[in-house]
Amino acid sequence: MNEYRSSLVFATPDVPLRDDVRRLGALVGDLLAEQVSADFLEEIERIRTTAIARRESDTPPAGLLSLLEGREPRAAEALVRAFSTYFQVVNIAERVHRIRRRRDYQRSGTDTPQPEGLHDALRRLKAQGVTLDELSEWLPRIDVEPVFTAHPTEAVRRALLEKEQLMVASLVDNLDGMRTPNERATDAARFRMALTASWQTADSSPVRPTVEDEREHVGFYLTQVLYRVIPVMYETLEHAIEETYGSTLALPRLLRFGTWVGGDMDGNPNVDAHTIAGTLDAQRRAVLDRYLNELWQLASLLSQSTTLVAVSPALSAQLERYQALLPDAAARSRPRHGDMPYRLLNDLMRARLQATLDDADGAYAAPAELEHDLQLILDSLEVNKGLHAGWFAVRRLLWRVRSFGFHLARLDVRQESSVHARAVADALGQADWDSQDATHRAGLLGPYASGEQALPQVDDEGNARLDAVFAALADARTRHGADALGSYIISMAHNRADVLTVLALARRGGLVDDAGAVPLDIVPLFETVDDLRGGTGTVQDLLADPVYRQHLRARGDTQMVMLGYSDSGKDGGIAASRWGLQRAQVELLEAAAELGVRLTFFHGRGGSIVRGGGKTTRALDAAPRGSVDGRLRVTEQGEVIHRKYGIRALALRSLEQMTGAVLLSSLRPRAPEPREDAWRPVMDLVAERSTVAYRGFVGAPDFMQYFRLATPIDVIERMTLGSRPSRRLGQDAALSNLRAIPWVFAWSQARAVIPGWYGVGSGLQAAVEAGHEDSLREMAQDWPFFRTFLDDIAMVLSKGDLNIAELFSRLAGPLHARFFPRIRDELALTKHWVKTLLGQRSLLQHDPRLALSIRLRNPYIDPISVLQVDLLQRWRATDGEDEELLRALVACVNGVAQGVQNTG
């Protein structure tokens, strides 16, 4: 049996997945025959078998090209959508299989819990000597915060996501072994209905989504998925603690959520003070509506009568206070529920919540007041035989209120440093501001940042826009409370002057508390290789600045620093990016500790490996010792949100994995590795030589022209994926101005995935030539950072295809001969050293499940990619004016994105 066929063997636990894939694949065939024709299905089968044969022989895709080229746009679009539909059902089957495997573990009753879950984490901690008292001391320090962003990487529209949820629900229902044949037939019919409706729904919206659309999109996951699973996460942790330690603990809040949607102004002119205010208002309405609905449902449970059961004196006293506070509501409720104190209090709590929603008299001043009421009910139920008469449901609502407050998710605001600099330069009348020394600028800013002097008001658009933003934040703090606001992030932060600038602008905008301090956490984002290298110096300067240090004392002597995975990779290649991020964390921690400041890292990770994606558990295991310390703040972008939080069971699993990983990394961090001192210079060399190779490639003359011809970047720029443009407004098409997301997306579509591996082979080869091969092998075996790095490169390489990348490259004409041989040679070098150092004959040999997932899809991705090359050539011949060809190309982009399971 050849390598390709043997790679498609399913392990015993995955046989149900194989059966689902076959069954759903047959269902797709039935769909195509019904919706198009039997001849169309036969053609799809012919193309599919040709693609598989091509994979088995590892030959150029000439046979595929001859089958696919020259098709009419609508016929091409139908073909692409047929293969995309297969990816859709395979992706769904795999997600449902994860739920199946989770249930298998839970049912097994063995002493081996599911890896990376909370039970697994606690058992490992106990085995390492962590006591219940130590766990109790640490839990209040745990703070896990996924932050949802609206980066344009979600290539599947909302209408299709909702239908996917219906398909998932029907498959999950079918997991029930007690289903009757009729019920299983109904499940299949529900799946077929949603699948057919998906086929009849256009893959992409004809208009670019607005900020409001993006807000609704993220709000869907927060209110429809995470809202429901948050209490279950805490219940799972309670059960795991009791099972592991034989005792229970009162759990503090461990999780909260953040969002950039409506607050990320960086390069997006559609985000401003109005979207900030509108987002906070919309989120408040959304979460209060959920509380109102849940209280309404609780009323049916809390029907206890005073003639049969008592209530606590504290609850009775609160009831009296509320009847005086809300006499009209009490008068309406008392005749019906006068003998039902819980229900009467519930009615009055709903009246207070409605007043909160309407900004009326009697409103709750803060979520803590609602929490207090719910706790009163819990305490009363507990002492009056009500543990099994509503206590459980009330506590679930309490966990939700603790997690979501009255704001749903904390809103971050982000803007680029140059925007602030231009505003201050105009305010101070200094046209040469950017050319002045950063230390000199910081000195000039000191009096304005401290409030000693007022930064002059200037009547221009840039200053007015920023003033409005800070005024909106001040108003939001009053209206929604401090918990509704996250951080103010400065992208492309280079020095302390960039941070002091924001402090001065915030004061001018009126964001000042009663004590005269600026109540804002200002976060520099280091996102280029050079800024990561210089980040320690910047933070040292910042923490030594008396004005900023005074500000920081008012913020609890805690400083957050955001690390950018995307632009650092685009700037210097993935090896320099990963190593720069690792070193920056170590050096920043040391610098902050010396100055008595607690540092928190905010990880700006994207969906793809290139942009810091991958499993959080492995990332934390590979992180520097002490860098977690109980806190994890990380962005969740684009297709990652759907993949991790689109299904309730998988959302719960994601939250458990993050929380468990933080507990492990914090309570029992990895022991120091003495050999790391010897390994760091080796990694320095790998990163340095990798950067030389990478920059030599992307910085070569005519490279950007080659990039624009050898990838479908021009199609991606025409797609309506998000509210933010693909490059910063008013700037040319240079690589430095192109955003990291479309940069990665374009190369992923071209199947070369250059940003995910280029230069790595050269870096490793240089280290070997310098006599470090034995060290590299030790690093791959014993250093989690390096092992994770190599594993990630292996995964990226597995998703690429050199033969198809060559088809794209030939679209560049004469430039193909200049650039593609370099790609081919560097790829061969990288594959060689990755496999050699990992001790593997083939990529992903250590992860057969992932290898199977990729190989299952590749024969179906290949026809779309080959067709994309043909369509791209024809579309460009029309100067990009043929809308039918463009629509077919957009379908190709969506299809490949579904197949490789990431975009940017």
From Swiss-Prot:
Keywords: Carbon dioxide fixation, Lyase, Magnesium
Superkingdom: Bacteria
Active-site annotation: 151, 570
Gene Ontology MF annotations: magnesium ion binding; phosphoenolpyruvate carboxylase activity
A GO cellular component entry from the record: cytosol
A UniProt-annotated Pfam family: PEPcase
Any coiled-coil regions, as ranges: none
Enzyme class at the top of the EC tree: lyase
InterPro entries: PEP_COase, PEP_COase_bac/pln-type, PEP_COase_Lys_AS, PEPCASE_His_AS, Pyrv/PenolPyrv_kinase-like_dom
Function: Forms oxaloacetate, a four-carbon dicarboxylic acid source for the tricarboxylic acid cycle.
Name under which the protein is recorded: Phosphoenolpyruvate carboxylase
Lineage, opening ranks: Bacteria, Pseudomonadati, Pseudomonadota, Gammaproteobacteria, Lysobacterales
The encoding gene: ppc
